[in-house]
Amino acid sequence: MTTPTTTAPITIETRVGAGKVEIFRCDRRAEEVTIGNAGGDVASLDGYTLHDEGSRHSIDLGQFGSLRPAQILVVTTGETASAEGDRVIWKTEDIWNNDGDTAVLIAPDGSAVSLPC
């Protein structure tokens, strides 16, 4: 006699939390800012914004969803901006090309991390 077996459905849950979203690089010549998740969990970009020094230009990063651990998002600007792979186009005008400009990443809690370009 065979005993029937049942298998409960498997639920895979992706944990999205604060993660550890950071600015990894700001390249004023290439007009690129690289944002990445340095944490061990998926990090939602909801509530994160990126702006230049003086806040003349600002972008809501939440529109790009979330980042897996070690995943990057390259925010491109300028005439040669492109959206391939992990790259997204912010603007087709130069943002970071002036001397002494700074990329500022604002977290949902209002804390800021900045990196000179």
What annotation goes with each model-predicted range?
Residues 1-117:
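Activation on beta-sandwich/Ig-like modules and their edge loops
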